[in-house]
Protein backbone atom coordinates (compact mmCIF):
# COMPACT_ATOMS: atom_id res chain seq x y z
CA UNK A 1 0.00 0.00 0.00
CA UNK A 2 1.42 3.36 -1.05
CA UNK A 3 1.78 6.14 1.47
CA UNK A 4 1.48 8.72 -1.27
CA UNK A 5 -1.20 11.24 -0.60
CA UNK A 6 -1.34 10.66 3.15
CA UNK A 7 -1.38 13.99 4.93
CA UNK A 8 0.17 14.40 8.34
CA UNK A 9 -1.90 16.33 10.84
CA UNK A 10 0.29 19.00 12.36
CA UNK A 11 -1.16 21.26 15.03
CA UNK A 12 0.13 24.83 14.76
CA UNK A 13 2.34 25.66 17.72
CA UNK A 14 2.49 22.08 19.05
CA UNK A 15 6.01 21.35 20.26
CA UNK A 16 5.57 18.66 22.91
CA UNK A 17 7.76 15.57 23.08
CA UNK A 18 8.17 12.83 25.67
CA UNK A 19 10.96 10.35 26.34
CA UNK A 20 9.89 7.47 28.58
CA UNK A 21 12.17 4.72 29.86
CA UNK A 22 10.35 1.58 30.98
CA UNK A 23 11.46 -1.87 32.15
CA UNK A 24 11.71 -4.18 29.14
CA UNK A 25 11.47 -7.65 30.69
CA UNK A 26 9.44 -8.24 33.87
CA UNK A 27 9.27 -11.76 35.30
CA UNK A 28 7.20 -12.26 38.46
CA UNK A 29 6.18 -15.56 39.99
CA UNK A 30 7.08 -18.93 41.43
CA UNK A 31 10.72 -19.91 40.81
CA UNK A 32 11.21 -16.78 38.70
CA UNK A 33 14.97 -16.89 39.32
CA UNK A 34 15.19 -19.98 37.12
CA UNK A 35 14.31 -17.78 34.15
CA UNK A 36 17.29 -15.50 34.69
CA UNK A 37 19.44 -16.94 31.87
CA UNK A 38 16.54 -16.51 29.44
CA UNK A 39 16.06 -12.89 30.55
CA UNK A 40 19.75 -12.10 30.02
CA UNK A 41 19.66 -13.78 26.63
CA UNK A 42 16.59 -11.79 25.61
CA UNK A 43 18.19 -8.52 26.72
CA UNK A 44 21.32 -9.35 24.69
CA UNK A 45 23.78 -8.05 27.23
CA UNK A 46 27.54 -8.63 27.21
CA UNK A 47 29.41 -11.32 29.14
CA UNK A 48 30.58 -9.33 32.16
CA UNK A 49 28.08 -9.12 35.02
CA UNK A 50 28.37 -7.68 38.53
CA UNK A 51 25.99 -8.60 41.33
CA UNK A 52 25.24 -5.94 43.94
CA UNK A 53 23.96 -7.66 47.08
CA UNK A 54 24.02 -7.69 50.85
CA UNK A 55 25.41 -10.61 52.84
CA UNK A 56 21.98 -12.06 53.56
CA UNK A 57 20.49 -11.39 50.12
CA UNK A 58 23.50 -13.04 48.53
CA UNK A 59 22.53 -16.21 50.38
CA UNK A 60 18.82 -15.79 49.65
CA UNK A 61 19.11 -15.20 45.89
CA UNK A 62 22.57 -14.04 44.80
CA UNK A 63 24.27 -17.43 44.99
CA UNK A 64 21.49 -18.99 42.92
CA UNK A 65 21.84 -16.30 40.25
CA UNK A 66 25.60 -16.87 40.14
CA UNK A 67 24.99 -20.59 39.67
CA UNK A 68 22.53 -20.00 36.84
CA UNK A 69 24.67 -17.47 34.97
CA UNK A 70 28.13 -18.97 35.53
CA UNK A 71 28.11 -21.15 32.37
CA UNK A 72 27.64 -18.15 30.07
CA UNK A 73 28.84 -15.06 31.96
CA UNK A 74 31.82 -13.71 33.87
CA UNK A 75 30.40 -12.81 37.28
CA UNK A 76 31.76 -10.65 40.09
CA UNK A 77 30.15 -9.44 43.30
CA UNK A 78 29.98 -6.15 45.20
CA UNK A 79 28.64 -6.18 48.75
CA UNK A 80 26.52 -3.06 49.23
CA UNK A 81 26.74 -2.26 52.93
CA UNK A 82 25.48 1.32 53.15
CA UNK A 83 23.53 3.67 50.92
CA UNK A 84 25.95 6.60 51.15
CA UNK A 85 27.97 8.70 48.67
CA UNK A 86 31.09 6.82 49.78
CA UNK A 87 29.57 3.42 49.02
CA UNK A 88 28.38 4.76 45.65
CA UNK A 89 31.95 5.68 44.75
CA UNK A 90 33.20 2.23 45.80
CA UNK A 91 30.49 0.60 43.72
CA UNK A 92 31.33 2.68 40.67
CA UNK A 93 35.01 1.77 40.93
CA UNK A 94 34.15 -1.92 41.25
CA UNK A 95 31.66 -1.94 38.36
CA UNK A 96 33.77 0.04 35.91
CA UNK A 97 34.06 -2.03 32.73
CA UNK A 98 31.21 -4.50 33.30
CA UNK A 99 28.30 -4.89 30.89
CA UNK A 100 25.44 -5.33 33.36
CA UNK A 101 24.67 -4.67 37.01
CA UNK A 102 22.22 -6.88 38.90
CA UNK A 103 20.80 -5.51 42.16
CA UNK A 104 19.79 -8.34 44.50
CA UNK A 105 18.08 -7.33 47.73
CA UNK A 106 15.87 -4.74 49.34
CA UNK A 107 15.67 -1.01 48.87
CA UNK A 108 19.23 -0.23 49.95
CA UNK A 109 20.87 -2.67 47.57
CA UNK A 110 18.60 -1.96 44.62
CA UNK A 111 19.01 1.81 45.03
CA UNK A 112 22.79 1.35 45.18
CA UNK A 113 22.74 -0.67 41.96
CA UNK A 114 20.37 1.83 40.37
CA UNK A 115 22.52 4.87 41.14
CA UNK A 116 25.79 3.19 40.14
CA UNK A 117 24.32 1.90 36.88
CA UNK A 118 22.95 5.37 36.11
CA UNK A 119 26.27 7.09 36.83
CA UNK A 120 28.16 4.56 34.68
CA UNK A 121 25.45 4.47 31.99
CA UNK A 122 25.03 0.72 32.39
CA UNK A 123 21.86 -1.39 32.25
CA UNK A 124 20.74 -3.08 35.43
CA UNK A 125 18.29 -5.76 36.46
CA UNK A 126 16.31 -5.44 39.68
CA UNK A 127 15.93 -8.60 41.77
CA UNK A 128 13.90 -7.74 44.88
CA UNK A 129 14.13 -10.15 47.80
CA UNK A 130 11.39 -8.22 49.62
CA UNK A 131 8.47 -6.11 48.44
CA UNK A 132 8.80 -3.20 50.85
CA UNK A 133 8.56 -0.20 48.48
CA UNK A 134 7.94 0.80 44.87
CA UNK A 135 11.57 1.54 44.02
CA UNK A 136 12.05 -1.95 42.59
CA UNK A 137 10.94 -0.79 39.14
CA UNK A 138 11.14 3.01 39.26
CA UNK A 139 13.65 5.50 37.94
CA UNK A 140 14.06 7.13 41.35
CA UNK A 141 16.55 6.27 44.08
CA UNK A 142 17.19 7.44 47.64
CA UNK A 143 20.63 8.30 48.98
CA UNK A 144 21.48 8.91 52.63
CA UNK A 145 23.26 12.21 53.22
CA UNK A 146 24.18 14.21 56.32
CA UNK A 147 20.88 16.08 55.92
CA UNK A 148 18.74 12.96 55.57
CA UNK A 149 17.41 11.04 52.60
CA UNK A 150 17.81 12.64 49.15
CA UNK A 151 15.74 11.58 46.14
CA UNK A 152 17.82 11.14 42.98
CA UNK A 153 16.99 10.67 39.32
CA UNK A 154 18.18 7.41 37.76
CA UNK A 155 17.16 4.98 35.06
CA UNK A 156 14.46 2.37 35.71
CA UNK A 157 15.74 -1.20 35.53
CA UNK A 158 16.04 -2.84 32.13
CA UNK A 159 14.50 -5.92 33.70
CA UNK A 160 12.80 -7.04 36.91
CA UNK A 161 12.95 -10.63 38.14
CA UNK A 162 10.85 -11.14 41.27
CA UNK A 163 10.63 -14.63 42.74
CA UNK A 164 7.43 -14.76 44.79
CA UNK A 165 8.71 -17.69 46.86
CA UNK A 166 11.65 -15.62 48.08
CA UNK A 167 9.54 -12.51 48.66
CA UNK A 168 6.84 -14.44 50.53
CA UNK A 169 9.49 -15.88 52.86
CA UNK A 170 10.64 -12.41 53.94
CA UNK A 171 9.20 -10.87 57.13
CA UNK A 172 5.56 -9.86 56.60
CA UNK A 173 6.35 -6.41 57.93
CA UNK A 174 8.22 -5.72 54.68
CA UNK A 175 5.32 -6.80 52.48
CA UNK A 176 2.87 -4.74 54.55
CA UNK A 177 5.13 -1.71 54.15
CA UNK A 178 5.11 -2.22 50.39
CA UNK A 179 1.32 -2.31 50.42
CA UNK A 180 1.22 0.93 52.40
CA UNK A 181 3.58 2.54 49.91
CA UNK A 182 1.17 1.63 47.09
CA UNK A 183 -1.91 2.81 48.97
CA UNK A 184 -0.18 6.17 49.46
CA UNK A 185 -0.59 6.72 45.71
CA UNK A 186 -4.13 7.86 46.48
CA UNK A 187 -3.06 11.02 48.28
CA UNK A 188 -0.01 11.57 46.09
CA UNK A 189 -2.37 11.90 43.12
CA UNK A 190 -4.69 14.23 45.04
CA UNK A 191 -1.74 16.49 45.87
CA UNK A 192 -0.61 16.47 42.24
CA UNK A 193 -4.08 17.38 41.01
CA UNK A 194 -4.32 20.10 43.66
CA UNK A 195 -1.00 21.54 42.52
CA UNK A 196 -2.29 21.51 38.95
CA UNK A 197 -5.37 23.50 39.94
CA UNK A 198 -3.63 25.97 42.24
CA UNK A 199 -0.16 26.26 40.72
CA UNK A 200 -0.66 25.17 37.12
CA UNK A 201 1.74 22.24 37.52
CA UNK A 202 1.45 19.93 34.48
CA UNK A 203 -0.10 16.52 35.12
CA UNK A 204 -0.16 13.25 33.21
CA UNK A 205 -3.62 11.70 32.99
CA UNK A 206 -2.09 8.37 31.95
CA UNK A 207 0.25 8.26 34.95
CA UNK A 208 -2.54 9.35 37.31
CA UNK A 209 -4.93 6.71 35.98
CA UNK A 210 -2.37 3.91 36.29
CA UNK A 211 -1.29 4.99 39.77
CA UNK A 212 -4.88 5.28 41.02
CA UNK A 213 -5.88 1.93 39.51
CA UNK A 214 -2.89 0.26 41.18
CA UNK A 215 -3.89 1.62 44.60
CA UNK A 216 -7.55 0.71 44.05
CA UNK A 217 -6.76 -2.91 43.17
CA UNK A 218 -4.59 -3.32 46.25
CA UNK A 219 -7.19 -1.66 48.49
CA UNK A 220 -9.89 -3.96 47.14
CA UNK A 221 -7.75 -7.02 47.83
CA UNK A 222 -6.42 -5.88 51.22
CA UNK A 223 -8.20 -8.71 53.12
CA UNK A 224 -6.38 -11.23 50.91
CA UNK A 225 -2.87 -10.02 51.80
CA UNK A 226 -1.59 -12.69 54.17
CA UNK A 227 1.84 -13.45 55.67
CA UNK A 228 4.11 -15.80 53.75
CA UNK A 229 1.68 -16.51 50.91
CA UNK A 230 3.05 -16.44 47.35
CA UNK A 231 -0.31 -15.25 46.03
CA UNK A 232 -0.04 -12.19 48.28
CA UNK A 233 3.54 -11.55 47.20
CA UNK A 234 2.46 -11.89 43.56
CA UNK A 235 -0.28 -9.29 44.01
CA UNK A 236 1.94 -6.78 45.82
CA UNK A 237 4.93 -7.06 43.48
CA UNK A 238 2.73 -6.50 40.44
CA UNK A 239 1.39 -3.36 42.12
CA UNK A 240 4.90 -2.12 42.95
CA UNK A 241 6.03 -2.60 39.35
CA UNK A 242 2.89 -0.86 38.08
CA UNK A 243 3.57 2.10 40.38
CA UNK A 244 7.13 2.30 39.08
CA UNK A 245 5.83 2.36 35.51
CA UNK A 246 3.45 5.21 36.41
CA UNK A 247 6.45 7.20 37.62
CA UNK A 248 8.32 6.41 34.41
CA UNK A 249 5.39 7.67 32.35
CA UNK A 250 5.23 10.87 34.41
CA UNK A 251 8.97 11.38 34.32
CA UNK A 252 8.95 11.99 38.07
CA UNK A 253 7.80 10.40 41.32
CA UNK A 254 4.69 12.63 41.40
CA UNK A 255 2.17 9.79 40.83
CA UNK A 256 3.45 8.06 43.96
CA UNK A 257 4.82 10.78 46.22
CA UNK A 258 3.02 13.67 47.89
CA UNK A 259 2.52 15.06 51.37
CA UNK A 260 2.49 11.57 52.87
CA UNK A 261 6.03 10.99 51.57
CA UNK A 262 7.16 14.35 52.93
CA UNK A 263 5.82 13.25 56.32
CA UNK A 264 7.67 9.94 55.96
CA UNK A 265 10.99 11.66 55.23
CA UNK A 266 10.48 14.07 58.14
CA UNK A 267 9.71 11.18 60.48
CA UNK A 268 12.85 9.42 59.27
CA UNK A 269 14.92 12.45 60.28
CA UNK A 270 13.27 12.88 63.69
CA UNK A 271 12.97 9.19 64.59
CA UNK A 272 15.61 7.37 62.53
CA UNK A 273 15.28 3.62 62.33
CA UNK A 274 11.83 3.45 63.90
CA UNK A 275 9.63 3.11 60.81
CA UNK A 276 10.04 1.54 57.42
CA UNK A 277 9.51 3.98 54.57
CA UNK A 278 6.19 2.43 53.54
CA UNK A 279 4.92 2.26 57.12
CA UNK A 280 5.40 5.99 57.63
CA UNK A 281 3.84 6.68 54.23
CA UNK A 282 0.79 4.66 55.24
CA UNK A 283 0.25 6.70 58.40
CA UNK A 284 0.83 9.86 56.41
CA UNK A 285 -1.76 8.75 53.86
CA UNK A 286 -4.47 8.52 56.53
CA UNK A 287 -3.68 12.09 57.58
CA UNK A 288 -3.47 13.51 54.05
CA UNK A 289 -6.70 11.79 53.02
CA UNK A 290 -8.45 13.41 55.98
CA UNK A 291 -7.13 16.81 54.92
CA UNK A 292 -8.33 16.19 51.36
CA UNK A 293 -11.79 15.29 52.69
CA UNK A 294 -11.58 11.72 51.42
CA UNK A 295 -12.27 8.29 52.92
CA UNK A 296 -9.48 8.26 55.49
CA UNK A 297 -11.25 5.58 57.52
CA UNK A 298 -11.22 3.28 54.48
CA UNK A 299 -7.47 3.82 54.14
CA UNK A 300 -6.95 3.04 57.82
CA UNK A 301 -9.08 -0.11 57.63
CA UNK A 302 -7.17 -1.41 54.60
CA UNK A 303 -3.83 -0.83 56.33
CA UNK A 304 -5.07 -2.65 59.42
CA UNK A 305 -6.27 -5.59 57.31
CA UNK A 306 -2.85 -5.83 55.68
CA UNK A 307 -1.06 -5.65 59.02
CA UNK A 308 0.53 -2.23 58.56
CA UNK A 309 0.73 0.24 61.47
CA UNK A 310 -1.78 3.10 61.59
CA UNK A 311 -0.50 5.03 64.62
CA UNK A 312 2.91 6.33 65.73
CA UNK A 313 2.60 4.31 68.95
CA UNK A 314 2.70 1.05 66.99
CA UNK A 315 6.14 2.08 65.76
CA UNK A 316 7.36 3.18 69.16
CA UNK A 317 7.28 6.84 68.12
CA UNK A 318 5.94 9.42 70.62
CA UNK A 319 2.99 11.43 69.36
CA UNK A 320 4.84 14.70 69.86
CA UNK A 321 7.54 13.50 67.45
CA UNK A 322 4.88 12.68 64.87
CA UNK A 323 3.42 16.17 65.35
CA UNK A 324 6.87 17.69 64.81
CA UNK A 325 7.26 15.59 61.65
CA UNK A 326 3.95 16.91 60.34
CA UNK A 327 5.10 20.47 60.94
CA UNK A 328 8.48 19.78 59.31
CA UNK A 329 7.03 17.91 56.32
CA UNK A 330 6.29 20.94 54.16
CA UNK A 331 9.97 21.93 54.30
CA UNK A 332 10.96 18.64 52.63
CA UNK A 333 11.27 19.21 48.88
CA UNK A 334 9.54 22.62 49.15
CA UNK A 335 9.27 22.84 45.37
CA UNK A 336 6.76 19.96 45.44
CA UNK A 337 3.39 21.44 46.41
CA UNK A 338 1.09 19.39 48.63
CA UNK A 339 -1.94 20.01 50.79
CA UNK A 340 0.43 20.63 53.70
CA UNK A 341 1.35 23.92 52.03
CA UNK A 342 -2.20 25.18 52.58
CA UNK A 343 -1.35 26.12 56.16
CA UNK A 344 -1.12 23.72 59.10
CA UNK A 345 -0.90 24.93 62.69
CA UNK A 346 0.72 22.93 65.47
CA UNK A 347 -2.66 22.70 67.17
CA UNK A 348 -4.17 21.17 64.02
CA UNK A 349 -1.22 18.82 63.63
CA UNK A 350 -1.73 17.59 67.19
CA UNK A 351 -5.42 16.98 66.47
CA UNK A 352 -4.52 15.04 63.31
CA UNK A 353 -2.24 12.68 65.21
CA UNK A 354 -4.96 12.12 67.82
CA UNK A 355 -7.35 11.36 64.98
CA UNK A 356 -5.31 8.27 64.13
CA UNK A 357 -6.33 6.64 67.41
CA UNK A 358 -10.04 7.43 67.12
CA UNK A 359 -12.92 5.19 66.15
Swiss-Prot record:
Belongs to the glycerol-1-phosphate dehydrogenase family. It is found in: Cytoplasm. Keywords: Cytoplasm, Lipid biosynthesis, Lipid metabolism, Metal-binding, NAD, NADP, Oxidoreductase, Phospholipid biosynthesis, Phospholipid metabolism, Zinc. GO terms for biological process: glycerophospholipid metabolic process; phospholipid biosynthetic process. CDD domains: Gro1PDH (cd08173). NAD(+) binds at residues 107-111, 129-132, 138. Pfam families: Fe-ADH_2 (PF13685). It comes from the Archaea. The lineage of its organism: Archaea, Methanobacteriati, Methanobacteriota, Stenosarchaea group, Methanomicrobia. Pathway: Membrane lipid metabolism; glycerophospholipid metabolism. Catalyzes the NAD(P)H-dependent reduction of dihydroxyacetonephosphate (DHAP or glycerone phosphate) to glycerol 1-phosphate (G1P). The G1P thus generated is used as the glycerophosphate backbone of phospholipids in the cellular membranes of Archaea. Its main location: cytoplasm. The gene is egsA. This is Glycerol-1-phosphate dehydrogenase [NAD(P)+]. One of its GO terms (cellular component) is cytoplasm. Substrate binds at residues 134, 181, 265. Gene3D superfamilies: 3.40.50.1970, Dehydroquinate synthase-like - alpha domain.
Amino acid sequence: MSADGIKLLRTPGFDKSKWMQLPRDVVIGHNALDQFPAVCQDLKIGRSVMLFAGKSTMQVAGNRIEELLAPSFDISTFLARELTPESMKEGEEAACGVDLIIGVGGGRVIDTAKIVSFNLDLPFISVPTAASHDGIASGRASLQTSEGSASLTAHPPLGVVADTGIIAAAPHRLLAAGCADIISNYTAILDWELSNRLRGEPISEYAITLSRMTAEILMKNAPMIRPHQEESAWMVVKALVSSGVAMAIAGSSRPASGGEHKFSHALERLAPGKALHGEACGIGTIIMMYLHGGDWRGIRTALQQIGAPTTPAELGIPDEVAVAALMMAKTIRPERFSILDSGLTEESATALIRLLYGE
